[in-house]
Amino acid sequence: MTDNILGNLQQKKHNMNGNKISGAEAIIKSFLSEGVDTVFGYPGGAIIPVYDVLYGYKKELRHILVRHEQAAIHAAQGYARVTGRTGVAMVTSGPGATNIITGITDALIDSTPLVVITGQVGNSGLGTDAFQETDVIGITQPVTKWSCQVRRAEDIPEAIARAFHIASTGRPGPVVLDITKDAQVHTMEWHYEKCNFIRSYIPYPDISDEAVAQAAELINNAERPMIIAGHGVMISGAEKELAEMAEKADIPVVCTLLGLSSIPSSHPLYKGMAGMHGNIGPNVNTNKCDVLIAIGMRFDDRVTGDTSKYAPQAKIVHIDIDPSEFNKNIRATVPVLGDAKTVLGKLIPMLRKNGHKEWLTTFNRPEAVEYEKVIKPETEPSEGMMNMGEVARRVSEATNNDAILVTDVGQNQMLSARYFKFSRPDSIVTSGGLGTMGFGLPAAIGAKIGQPGRQVCLFVGDGGLQMTIQELGTIFEYKVPVKIILLNNNFLGMVRQWQELFFHKHYSETPMVNPDFVALCKAYGINGEDVVERKDLGQAIKRMLDSDEAYLLNVCIQPYNMVFPMTPAGSNVDNIMLNATEHYI
């Protein structure tokens, strides 16, 4: 690696005021120039100069001290997902830097814009195995959109400007800047210019009018069209266009897990969630539609199942800003490269006003079967211990379906996503592609800090909560009033479900002996209560939501709660289990 990785860049002298400042102060002033108001982080030796400068900028820049560096990334993700802004985190070298890897991988897969600053040893210590030296660039290159080491103070403003531009444009993602101690302590002439262009980086390619016209022709001639909306709809801010397109052409809309809330749950054309634990209608009709319009989604295996049997009858229109997603998993008849909002803006005027009444009625039977066989038993049980689905439904109803749902990973994620309802966009924060247990608690902190005026409800299992439970300390210190619904079944529930269905009920290392979670919350200065009986759930939810402070409900769930419907991994999407013994026919 050269001594100055940015040395080939022309040094900019715009907006210079003659003030010499340290590289550490340049980092803080660069953040402020980008409109950053919150940084999640954890100090250490190689980043101390920046924290020393931060001491004098407390009024301008809020810092949230997490209890583990992984949590800094997840909190920044939560913040970014609910605000549409770039999340910012800052950690030290060595273990501080290695602790961020899970978080930035999660952000890369789920297209979350982050700028992460890692401290690094001094220039002379590079490559010497100095104390807390790690090859941050080598480690992070595979799991970031861009990573760069900065060794000179004068290169810091341009590196940060580029980082924000790259992280937030095109398909968003995480950027890591590894800044040596020399760069932090040496001085430079302060200047800053936001980056709007990088040669060879084209975040918003020209949209092919021919491809849009071909897509319009397929949709106009379709008898059984279906839209599958992914996370890219909300990233581009195309929620209005999605609804307008669906209404004009009378097309049913289904969502991926990360696409939930891109259209209101109450919309008459919304037909549910697609995927392994999605609704029956969307999955069955994937293999019956004649034109499938995929918008801002990547045909993940949890949506497609067996790709050789996924929508073989359909012509597929795939709209995405990332060309690498085209034909990667599912071959598109018409790939349309571009930002979803811009593409739909061109496509909608070409669509004929249409009606598909008969096609829309084909969702009725699977909806009825799902209600009787799955939804009613899960959400309206009359006896026994509580189910996860009924808790999610009742919390959603108590918030008038207007809360931000944050989930951890596992059964809690799938059942809350299934039974929570959404009235406005950007209302779900979850770990989709990587499936990171421990994501939920810090992500909820970031979401609440980003949207303090909205109720933030975290659904988490007893396994996932204990992976980042130390962040209760962050909640207490900063008085972050998140509502934590702990679905406690004393199991690693999703793994246990697979063991029950596919591994002869060999519950190998999935039962859990748990602490007293309410007492633990009390030790952290957080309110909490146990909810054992169904009759007590309603008032407990009310007390939680009425509280102005953080609150935990430890809800005792029946240990063998299952998530259905379920399409077994690697199966075709219309091979759907209604329960352990019945399939949808």
Language model segments and positions:
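Phosphate/pyrophosphate-binding active-site segments
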Residues: 5-18, 154, 192, 217, ...
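Glycine-rich, acidic loop regions that bind phosphate or pyrophosphate groups
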Residues: 5-6, 118-159, 259-363, 541
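Active-site diphosphate/adenylate-binding microenvironment
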Residues: 24-28, 32-37, 45, 50-55, ...
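Glycine-rich phosphate/diphosphate-binding loops that line cofactor/substrate pockets in enzymes
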Residues: 24-36, 78-84, 108, 166-171, ...
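Thiamine diphosphate
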Residues: 48-123, 127, 131-132, 276, 281-292, 296-300, 414-492, ...
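Glycine-rich, anion-gripping cofactor-binding loops and their flanking helix/strand elements
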Residues: 81, 231-317, 422-454, 468-469, ...
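Conformationally flexible catalytic loops at phosphate/diphosphate-handling active centers
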Residues: 166-221, 375-376
